[in-house]
């Protein structure tokens, strides 16, 4: 029996050679491989395959998947592949072909009475997003981020304090302990950052031992060369990452002094971008350093006709500045430069900036990391054409580059990639399903550690799940006992060895960060470009390897108003 491509795609989803448009963008992906078997596909429902004696075997629970996602199109840094995905004990068990091995050939994911089915036909499956620039200003950020497809948040803070509103820091053992307890019921993998702005090591050591997963150097606390050097030395001692927001005012040194203080040690440079902060106007030059792992934040993503006007007011609020003080206004204006914002678009597209993040409620939008990433990719496709390596028929290389920016690369940077960051066997089953028309905008399901944690849901009193009003709601995996079995609190190895989780009576899964100190830009997936950078001190023109980087602001974007009428 033969089926037309259209009929096959409508029944089982796209297969090799089929192309899929991502939302209303100009980005198209093409299926590279299909791990299912034609004629042996499994699908659940009335008159379908996954029934007793057919696609469902008689095997016991230990031998079968707890959950199978059938016929999903995986989009990840390593490929764009159609497959069944088996989950077991909260982890990605196997990626391959699901079914009944007693009667079907080449089965790698046995199904049985213990198996739940999630229908992935016609849907895209991605890893949960990772946002590594979180200001813990309010706990409600978690729900907003989760509903957008983010499943891991790394940052610092204690609530709407002035220090937290400006800097991603949870300072000192008492705050670290109380915050670790406070986040224990939140449906999100979380790691806290401590304060790294110190010239002596012991106050940093005690924070690492108290449970932070990394350290933050921020100019508002004084990002001096001495503090940078000391912080990186302690980070090397304990194998934790350091994130830095450099000195916008160039008070304690210029960019060259900051880079010298790094001493070729690995560091995650926040705001390596056009307007977010750091050495003005040339923080973008840090991109050319192999030891620098650069990220930018979503308020400038992508460059549009409204970007400049929006930023001045945001900056005054976030950094506790007074519009009546001329020096404060000058500080704000020094950080917002249309030339460097435009260059940021292109540097993201070239793979020179390796990561995307939010800067939640501190100029960035916590629920828009994923949207802004794909809007940037779309704008660059329209303005710059196909990436090298992409054919005219698809954008697979560009899509892999951009999805790595908020999944695997932040996981590698912060030492979390042994647990999360990709759709790979053995990792925590943090997965997001998307209908292609809503890709990057509105997920159809968020799976957290193998449990459904969030999904759009209709009227609870309706006879079926779909009647209006439909909106995102927490599911069983987002409630406390579900959270404790499916979400990770990341700690330093020193804190784990010191029994911090037991002392604080933490109930979430606990995992260490590791392998953070020897990585370089070369370890970033699809984002390894290390150009020689130049920023003109007066015109702010940006050049990478001698090429002038400039582009026009967008006056219209996809993934925007047409998706948010209600």
Curated annotation (Swiss-Prot):
CDD domains associated with the record: Urease_alpha (cd00375)
Molecular function GO labels: nickel cation binding; urease activity
InterPro entries: Amidohydro-rel, Metal-dep_hydrolase_composite, Metal_Hydrolase, Urease_alpha_N_dom, Urease_alpha_subunit, Urease_AS, Urease_asu, Urease_asu_c
UniProtKB keywords: Cytoplasm, Hydrolase, Metal-binding, Nickel
Annotated compartments: Cytoplasm
Enzyme class: hydrolase
Modified residues (N6-carboxylysine): 216
Pathway: Nitrogen metabolism; urea degradation; CO(2) and NH(3) from urea (urease route): step 1/1
GO CC, one annotated term: cytoplasm
Family annotation (PROSITE patterns): UREASE_1, UREASE_2, UREASE_3
Chief place of localization: cytoplasm
GO terms classed as biological process: urea catabolic process
Cofactor requirement: Ni cation
Annotated catalytic residues: 319 (proton donor)
Sequence positions that bind Ni(2+) 1: 133, 135, 216, 359
Cofactor note: Binds 2 nickel ions per subunit.
Catalyzed reaction equations: urea + 2 H2O + H(+) = hydrogencarbonate + 2 NH4(+)
Residue stretches making up the Urease domain: 128-566
EC numbers: 3.5.1.5
Pfam families, A to Z: Amidohydro_1, Urease_alpha
Family listed: Belongs to the metallo-dependent hydrolases superfamily. Urease alpha subunit family.
Subunit structure: Heterotrimer of UreA (gamma), UreB (beta) and UreC (alpha) subunits. Three heterotrimers associate to form the active enzyme.
Name listed for the protein in its UniProt record: Urease subunit alpha
């Amino acid at each position: 029996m033969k089926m037309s491509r259209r009929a096959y795609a409508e029944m089982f989803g796209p297969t090799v050679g089929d192309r899929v448009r991502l939302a209303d963008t100009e980005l198209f992906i093409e299926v590279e491989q299909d791990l299912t078997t034609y004629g042996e596909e499994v699908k659940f429902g009335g008159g379908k395959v996954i029934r007793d004696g057919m696609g469902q075997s008689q095997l016991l629970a230990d031998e079968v998947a707890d959950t199978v996602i059938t016929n999903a199109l995986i989009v990840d840094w390593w490929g764009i592949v159609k497959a069944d995905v088996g989950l077991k004990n909260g982890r990605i068990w196997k990626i391959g072909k699901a079914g009944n091995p007693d009667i079907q050939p080449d089965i790698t994911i046995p199904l049985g009475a213990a198996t739940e089915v999630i229908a992935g036909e016609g849907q895209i499956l991605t890893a949960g997003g990772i946002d590594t620039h979180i200001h813990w200003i309010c706990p409600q950020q978690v729900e907003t981020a989760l509903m957008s497809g983010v499943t891991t948040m790394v940052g610092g803070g204690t609530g709407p304090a002035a220090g937290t509103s400006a800097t991603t820091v949870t300072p000192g053992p008492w705050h670290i302990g109380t915050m670790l307890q406070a986040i224990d019921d939140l449906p999100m993998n979380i790691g806290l950052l401590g304060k790294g702005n110190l010239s002596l090591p012991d106050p940093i050591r005690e924070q690492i031992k108290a449970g932070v997963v990394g350290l933050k150097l921020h100019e508002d606390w004084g990002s001096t060369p001495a503090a940078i050097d000391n912080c990186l030395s302690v980070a090397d001692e304990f194998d934790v990452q350091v994130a830095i927001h450099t000195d916008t005012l160039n008070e304690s040194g210029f960019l060259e002094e900051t880079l010298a203080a790094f001493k070729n040690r690995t560091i995650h440079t926040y705001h390596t971008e056009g307007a977010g902060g750091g050495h003005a106007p040339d923080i973008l030059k840090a991109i050319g350093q192999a030891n620098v792992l650069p990220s930018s934040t979503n308020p400038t993503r992508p460059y549009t006709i409204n970007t400049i006007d929006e930023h001045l007011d945001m900056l005054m609020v976030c950094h506790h500045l007074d519009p009546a003080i001329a020096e404060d206004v000058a500080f704000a204006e020094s950080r917002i430069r249309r030339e460097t914002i435009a260059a940021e678009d292109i540097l993201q597209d070239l793979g020179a900036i390796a990561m995307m993040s939010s800067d939640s409620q501190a100029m960035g939008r916590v629920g828009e990391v994923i949207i802004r990433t794909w809007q940037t990719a779309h704008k660059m496709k329209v303005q710059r054409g196909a990436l090298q390596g992409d054919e005219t028929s698809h954008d697979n290389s560009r899509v892999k580059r951009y999805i790595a920016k908020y999944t695997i690369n932040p996981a590698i940077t912060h030492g979390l990639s042994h647990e999360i960051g990709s759709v790979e066997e053995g990792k925590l089953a943090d997965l997001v399903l998307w209908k292609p028309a809503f890709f990057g905008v509105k997920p159809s399901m968020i799976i957290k550690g193998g449990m459904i944690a969030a999904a759009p849901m209709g009227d609870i009193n309706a006879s079926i799940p779909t009647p209006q009003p439909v909106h995102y709601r927490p599911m069983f995996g987002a409630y406390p006992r579900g959270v404790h079995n499916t979400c990770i609190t990341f700690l330093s190895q020193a804190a784990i060895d010191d029994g911090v989780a037991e002392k604080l009576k933490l109930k979430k899964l606990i995992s260490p960060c590791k392998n953070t100190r020897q990585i370089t830009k070369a370890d970033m997936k699809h984002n390894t470009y290390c150009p020689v950078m130049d920023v003109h001190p007066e015109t702010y023109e940006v050049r990478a390897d001698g090429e002038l980087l400039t582009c026009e602001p967008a006056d219209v974007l996809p993934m925007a108003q047409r998706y948010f009428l209600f």
